[in-house]
Amino acid sequence: MKLSPSAGGVSDQPPSPPEVAEEQKCLNSELWHACAGPLVSLPAVGSRVVYFPQGHSEQVAASTNKEMESQIPNYPNLPPQLICQLHNVTMHADAETDEVYAQMTLQPLSPQELKDPFLPAELGTASKQPTNYFCKTLTASDTSTHGGFSVPRRAAEKVFPPLDFTQQPPAQELMAKDLHGNEWKFRHIFRGQPKRHLLTTGWSVFVSAKRLVAGDSVLFIWNDSNQLLLGIRRANRPQTVMPSSVLSSDSMHIGLLAAAAHAASTNSRFTIFYNPRASPSEFVIPLAKYVKAVYHTRISVGMRFRMLFETEESSVRRYMGTITGISDLDPVRWMNSHWRSVKVGWDESTAGERQPRVSLWEIEPLTTFPMYPSPFPLRLKRPWPTGLPSLYGGKEDDLASSLMWLRDSQNTGFQSLNFGGLGMSPWMQPRLDSSLLGLQPDMYQTIAAAAALQNTTKQVSPAMLQFQQPQNIVGRSSLLSSQILQQAQPQFQQMYHQNINGNSIQGHSQPEYLQQPLQHCQSFNEQKPQLQPQQQQQESHQQQPQHQQMQQQKHLSNFQTVPNALSVFSQLSSTPQSTPSTLQTVSPFSQQHNFPDTNISCLSPSNVSSMHDTLRSFPSEAASDLPGVPRITPVPVSDPWSSKRVAVESTITSRPHDISSQIENFDLTPSSIPQNSTLAPLPGRECLVDQDGSSDPQNHFLFGVNIDSQSLLMQDGIPSLHNENSSSTIPYSTSNFLSPSQDDYPLSQTLTTPGCLDESGYVPCSDNADQVKRPHATFVKVYKSGTVGRLLDITRFSSYHELRSEVGRLFGLEGQLEDPLRSGWQLVFVDREDDVLLVGDDPWQEFVNSVSCIKILSPQEVQQMGKPGIELFSTSARRLGNSCDNYMSRQESRSLSTGIASVGSVEF
């Protein structure tokens, strides 16, 4: 069925192709948009839109002057908002009335398409509004048969071709085309007392043919092709009697609801008609516009806003109002709908013509902090570790509620949408890092990597390189990685030939204990058969230059599956008879090379306990020969949101001949080096590294391993293996790793006995970290324009919330700094590297260790701030050498008042 366009019906079948082709041929897009109105913008073909059946019903009610009856059946399967793909848009104009309308072909998205990530690049294609035009509402004299059309002087000089004033009277012939391509001729003359521009001959014919009356509007457009276009807008006059050819109002309501419900259940296409002049509001809007308004704007009762309205002269004007309520327009039939969910009150006395309810995407709140798009050039300097408290020191629920206004909590369809590209913060998407749940495996791998360091050549063992993910090494690190592998290749071959005889002797006894079931990583082993072909294919390409040598090692195929670094435990045992039992317990972990960021199946708490059992079975005699590994050193990473990679600052004992003899027994063949191994991250604030890769000149680290010749040997052998004052548990607050229950994980008793390493060298607790980063309490200067700066002991606080509360109390801004998204007040700080960052971007301890001074930005400074202001702010701090007492001189304050930028939402 095809309904009257004026009624905005729904059709399952589009009009016939000849009819569409004929209308498209005669239609001018610029003229159509001019007749539709300055606020009308059709979505782009191929984009995703949100269709509101509730708004479609309003168009039918406005066209038929009859609201939807209560006896109309309800469609429970039809959601209040339907996300669709826009396949086609066709602009039409009624042949008799010149009423413009658009025909859209929509197709609801499938559940799978709703889950796919969608990154809208625009908020809809802006309609091509004419720039050189004028619009006039006809008066009674303009529509009289004996008169003419009076054109305002300024409009005639702007749109019409210039008159020849040498003639008396000046006159010319004008030819204009309407929407259907019909040409209309008028005589343009400049006469009268006072003189004015008139359209005389041909005007009365045009008025009679179009049946124009007083109140209708006429548009004249001079386009880029030097053509004069003519359009009309009829005044909204509800029809008192509907023609018999048009379906009843109830039938139209039922038809559009049934068509939409059928399309939603079958994911089939359906066609709608949109009449911009008859519809109170747009009911098909771009998805990006909907997401911006609903998920990126926070409103509340009492908030001021402004809204655009069309004027009589086809221009726009902003009207001010106040939000008086937030609720569903029809909670019975359309529950959790965003259509006209905001009750408003208008300021002006003419507000009777305005709607008492509006939609979120129609208004512009005045007190909401700008969040989308963000003009602020700051980014996160350091990666935010998974599981840490959220931005403003509260719970993640508080952060989510401050960043978006989500009313359709019952609508699972919108919860499944991925709007990460629209400004949503990455920590709003909860992620469980499996490697953060298990702490002890990092220690084992750290010990093994340190022991595999070759002392004689000052090169990093490939057993250490296997723990570094190749694609996570940036810039110089990737280049150095390839150079080291090339330099170490001849050494691998030489060591392989030296040890092939010894390995062949051990090869007969190894399968006896290598065939034990892998009970502790069953979830990984279930995936291993799919991973083996890829690993074998990679190894085949790497082993082609050494094909002949590899033929001699066929009897060691079972032993090649054990990673080199983890097999160090068996080689470092002082008693040969303990090797089988040790390797038997280590082998289950040797199959687990990769630690994905979001997979928690391998390193569950049960596996952590099994690792404790493994370490308990490790003999103390073997542990006594292990070299000591001092504190962890960060490794630069490329992805700011990837897991923190453990960097091993390893040193070797003062017995080089013992280590050399042990290294000779290692199987360092390239075939035994996994190429896709990833070292699990060790949580802690010291693992957060600067993305610029800056480091101390005295630190000589390659992939996190100290290659300084002076630090390769430890002077006094292994350090103290036990600290009596250390706790046997890792507190959640100090370790900063993710725990769903926020409980403390007990350390293995083996680690706290005198026979093994002290955990203080691996777990960066608050005590030893503060000794390194901040040896004494630090007072930070806090600045605010127009007031005297205050000194603040930053170490007194434990969260951003406490800091914001205290700063607000000191400067009389109580409640303003805790909610910057609403108040507009922002805190920025200068770190010790002269970078300007938002307070709250970094984890709390990183902020404490790096803050140099803090600046309070007023809403005016926030709005004025831009990239030049950021550069000026940073340059001033660098010139003054981080001396916060002299940081804000009067002259610089005067410059910053015009240059300090707006701190919109931080983009990631």
Curated annotation (Swiss-Prot):
Main location: nucleus
SMART domains in alphabetical order: B3
GO cellular component, one term: nucleus
Tissue: Expressed in roots, culms, leaves and young panicles.
Gene3D superfamilies from the UniProt entry: 2.30.30.1040, DNA-binding pseudobarrel domain (2.40.330.10), Phosphatidylinositol 3-kinase Catalytic Subunit, Chain A, domain 1 (3.10.20.90)
GO MF terms, alphabetically ordered: DNA binding
DNA-binding region as annotated in the record: 134-236
Compartments it resides in: Nucleus
Disordered: annotated segments: 1-21, 525-556
PROSITE patterns documented for this protein: B3 (PS50863), PB1 (PS51745)
GO biological process: auxin-activated signaling pathway; regulation of DNA-templated transcription
SUPFAM superfamilies registered for this protein in UniProt: CAD & PB1 domains (SSF54277), DNA-binding pseudobarrel domain (SSF101936)
Low complexity: bias regions: 526-556
Pfam families given in the database record: ARF_AD, AUX_IAA, B3
Keyword terms: Auxin signaling pathway, DNA-binding, Nucleus, Transcription, Transcription regulation
Family: Belongs to the ARF family.
Domain notes: Interactions between auxin response factors (ARFs) and Aux/IAA proteins occur through their C-terminal dimerization domains III and IV.
PANTHER family, sorted: AUXIN RESPONSE FACTOR 4-RELATED (PTHR31384), AUXIN RESPONSE FACTOR 6 (PTHR31384:SF115)
The protein's assembly and partners: Homodimers and heterodimers.
Primary role: Auxin response factors (ARFs) are transcriptional factors that bind specifically to the DNA sequence 5'-TGTCTC-3' found in the auxin-responsive promoter elements (AuxREs).
Protein name: Auxin response factor 6
Organism whose genome encodes this protein: Oryza sativa subsp. japonica (Rice)
Lineage: Eukaryota, Viridiplantae, Streptophyta, Embryophyta, Tracheophyta
